[in-house]
Every structure is written in C-alpha cells, then in structure tokens.
Amino acid sequence: MFQYLYYIWEEPISISLGNWLNIGDIIIPYGLSLDSLAMTVMIPVGIVTLCVLLYAIEYMSHDPNRNTFYIILSVFAIFMTILVVSDNYIMMFIGWEFVGVISYLLISFWSTRIAAMKAALSAILLNRMGDTFFMLALGIFLSYFHAVDFDTLSLAAPYTNTLILNILSLLLLLAATAKSAQLGLHAWLLQAMEGPTPVSALLHAATMVCAGVYVLVRSYFILEYAPSLLIGICWLGGVTTLVSGLIAIVTNDIKKVIALSTMSQLSIMVLAIGISSYDLAIYHLYCHAFFKALLFMGAGSVIHSYISETQDMRKYGGLVNYLPFSYTAILIASLSLMAIPGLTGYYSKDIIIESLYGTYTFSGYILYYMAVGSATLTSLYSIRVLYLTFYNNPNSNKATYQHIHENIRMLIPMIILVIYSIFIGFNRDNVIGHYAMSLPANNSFIETEFTLPWYIKLLPLILGLSLSLLLVYIYEYAYKVRPSSIYNYFNNKIYYDQLLNNVIIRKTLIFGGYLNTYIDNGLLKVLGSTGISRALTYINIGIFLNLLYLFFFYR
C-alpha cells in the first residue's frame, strides 16, 4: 500500500515516533522512512516471508518444535522490516543485530545435529566481526557529525573531510562483507545450509544476506564521495563472484550450490554499487529474491521427498517423472538465474554486467570479463544441478523412488514465486525510475544503454548457452571422474576454512587464553576478594591492632 502511495504522490513518507536520546546537541530519533528504496526492498521481504511461512507449515509439519519455528521466523520478519524502514543508523543497527541473532537460532534449530550447532556458531561469530565494524561507524557518526539520521548525514557528506568518508565507507563495507558473505567473511553462508530449508529460502536468499547490500545502497551519500573505496568495492565483488562460481561448479550438495549462487549474485550487486549504479543493485536485489527463494523451495521439495533427506546430487537422478512441478519450479528459477531473455533475471543481471563495460575504464573492462566468466559459470552449475537431479540416470535404490512424491501444500507458495520469477522483471523502468542516488559524473547508465556494441551485450548469454550445451554433452558421452589438483582446490573451497582455522582462529584462541590468564583472572587475583584476603594475610597482626587503637582513641 505504501509503495502505491509513494508512486502516486512521488514523495517519501516519513513517520516520526519521537526521540530516543537527547544528549547535548546529539539527538537520536526514532522514526520510519517509507521512501522508494525502503518500499522496493519491503516488497520481496513481505512476499517471500509469506510464501516461506506457508511452505514451512508443511515442510516442518512433523517437527515437534514447529510452533517455535514459526514464531522465530515471524520475529525475524519484524526485525528485518525494522532494518529496512528505519530512518537512522541506530535503529537500522538494532534490526541488523537482531536478524543476526535470530539467524543463529534458526540455523541451530535442529539442535541435536552437531553440524548445525557448529554452523550457527560460525555464522554468529563471523557476523559479529561485521557488527564490530558497524559499531565503529556509528561511533564516528556520533562523534564527528553528532547525528545518525540519513537526512542530516546526506546533507553533511559533501562538506566532510575525505579521510573521514573513506574510513566510514571502509567500515560499512567490512560490515556488509560479513553480512552479505563476500570473500573473506563468507565461510558461514555455506555452513548455514545445515539449517531447515525454509530458513535458507528466507534468510540466505531474500532477506538477511541482502542486508549488507542494502546498507551500502542506503549509504550512497557517503560512498559517492569516497571514489577510492568504490574501486575497492568493485574488485571485492568481482573476485567474489568469480571464486564463488568456480567453487559451485565442483560442489555436490544441492543447497550449497544454491548458496554459492546467492554469494555470486550478491557480488554482482556489490559490483553495481562499485560503479555507482545503486538503482541497478537494488533492482537486482528486488528480482533476485523471488527466483532464489523459488530455487531453495524447489530444492527443499526434492530433499523432502527422499526418505533420507539427502542433499547430495550424486544420489539423485531421473526425478523429472516423479517431481514434475518441482522440476518446473527449479527449471524456471535456474533459467532466470542464468538471465535467459524473457525472465526476471535477464532484466536485472545483464544490465549490471554491461554497465561495467560502459564505464570505459581499465578496471571496468577487466571486471566486465570477470563478470562474464561468473555469468558463464552460473549457467554451467545451474545446468549441472538440473542434469544431476532430473535428467541423469537414477542413482538411488528402488524403495527410495517408490516413496518419492510431491506435497500440494508445499507447491502453492512455489506457484506464487514462479509467477514473480517470470513477470516481475517487466516492471524495471517503474522501479528504478524513482532513484537519483549517484553523482552525475559517476553515472554510466546512458553510455551503457546507447553506446555499447551488440556483442558486448550478448556475450554472457552466448557463452553461457554454448558452454552449457557442451557440459551436457560431456555428461552424456565423455564424462570421466579424474579429480585433478585444480578440482580438489575448488572442491575444498580454496582451502579457506583450513586457512581461517590455522592462521586466525587458533592464534586468536591462544591470545584469548593469555588475556584470560593474565588480565581477567590476574586482575581478580590482585584486586578482587582473593587478592584482598591474600594481602591481609601478609599484614602483621600487631600493626593492625595498633592502627585500630590509634583510630579509636586518638581521633
């Protein structure tokens, strides 16, 4: 309703609910900002949350704690809404913190699984690193600007020291890197697939992982005056989207492949932010939510149909006749992810890749070809998922296939998302026409739209389709299992987990042990009750009695 109001009156709706704190000249307001950016994000948040709740009613129907699950999922939707519609960074940080905490509860919902508990711990610890950088940014906002609301900061940004803006941009980028699973703080996203599939469909496709991108877009007035950081954002997105595609092409867990595709698409959004195309980034977020949630739901339908609930695609095969609607849903979502013309992904994804070339800079050219490589890999692993799951020869026993079936109540929300995955892309001009975020010197939309040669626009599509056909041919006629060192390198996720554990985690634990021994317990031994009692034992009792005598009789 609010989006329709905004489009009718062409002005944002601000609702002031009062002030939280008034300390000197620092005023922290409490209010809602229902502008075009917030409303564009609220549409997928609301629709996908509703579909996931309907889907979870059947998916979790046999779980004894299902009512708790529904409550936690609903509370998550509330705090995600607070994050999106807040009019200042403090209120946004509250939503940011709570969606992180609730994601821990949802990932570890099946608490009897050790892998799920470890995954939840990894998620909250890595996100806590991002929260730390966000808090540092809040401290700079309060100490330097004496304000945290978006309107005041956007007016002050053009007149602010460039060093301050660069530091703020870096802190917000690091916070977004953790929340949106960019390279360096991405390990938690794959491990989070241990949670229930409805959690993956909501948190790790449409809402929570997009929060980092949303914060960067909302902070456009800071990023626009920090051009050196924009280049860094571009390269972070380019490397992440390429690495995630290379890992996905050799991953066998169906949910982890989809999670890696989420990581890749988030990197495409980060690339758009790096070239100041904030409208394209938020529009891709808007479109991506629908077909990625559909992809997770389709995968959940496949997993739920197996007795063992296995996620290994090598144990699937021949399911096109057993799960026809799940096949249709995954097919449409995969084609949209591959940016096939006529589907939602084509209208939001390819224009970002074209815009990289449209910057006409050396970095833009390199990042364009990196993004084309990522788009090609996206087509390859999408076709690989379809082939191994539905077209390949059956790889499970007869009893498994006798019990495979689809549930009609799980299909209803998927039908809604199928419609959105096909038609929502036609609404592009109506959505992005309401943004005016980037500085004129940084805007490359006109060059992208009117000056690029045709082969630059069609290169991702041509490479993706041709190599996908080659992949199908290899699987049908020339497939041999010959793991190489390159295969093992990417199959082990570029050994990032081992590097993180051995270089950072172990050293941090040792350092924390020293701090606990010498600082925490050490202070207690010196200044606490133990230290006082030990000091008293060393005082001569005669001196103590003399002091008491002097105190009482000679005062």
From Swiss-Prot:
- Presence of keyword Transmembrane: yes
What the entry lists under InterPro entries is as follows: NADH_DH_su5_C, NADHpl_OxRdtase_5_subgr, ND/Mrp_TM, NU5C-like, Proton_antipo_N
* Pfam name, any one: Proton_antipo_M
Cellular component terms, GO, for this chain's entry? mitochondrial inner membrane
Main location per UniProt?
mitochondrion
Q: Name one GO molecular function term.
A: NADH dehydrogenase (ubiquinone) activity
Q: Where are the transmembrane segments?
A: 37-57, 69-89, 90-110, 133-153, 155-175, 197-217, 230-250, 257-275, 287-307, 323-343, 366-388, 406-426, 454-474, 494-516, 534-554
Kindly state which keywords UniProt assigns to this record, in alphabetical order. Answer: Electron transport, Membrane, Mitochondrion, Mitochondrion inner membrane, NAD, Respiratory chain, Translocase, Transmembrane, Transmembrane helix, Transport, Ubiquinone
Q: How does it sit in the membrane?
A: Multi-pass membrane protein
Which GO biological process annotations does it have? ATP synthesis coupled electron transport; electron transport coupled proton transport
- Give the Enzyme Commission number: 7.1.1.2
Reaction(s) catalysed (UniProt annotation): a ubiquinone + NADH + 5 H(+)(in) = a ubiquinol + NAD(+) + 4 H(+)(out)
Q: What class of enzyme is it?
A: translocase
Localisation = Mitochondrion inner membrane
Described function: Core subunit of the mitochondrial membrane respiratory chain NADH dehydrogenase (Complex I) that is believed to belong to the minimal assembly required for catalysis. Complex I functions in the transfer of electrons from NADH to the respiratory chain. The immediate electron acceptor for the enzyme is believed to be ubiquinone.
Q: Which family does it belong to?
A: Belongs to the complex I subunit 5 family.
Q: Which NCBIfam families match?
A: NDH_I_L (TIGR01974)
Any idea what this protein is called? NADH-ubiquinone oxidoreductase chain 5
Please report the organism this UniProt entry assigns to the protein.
Answer: Candida parapsilosis (Yeast)
> Quick one: which gene encodes this?
ND5
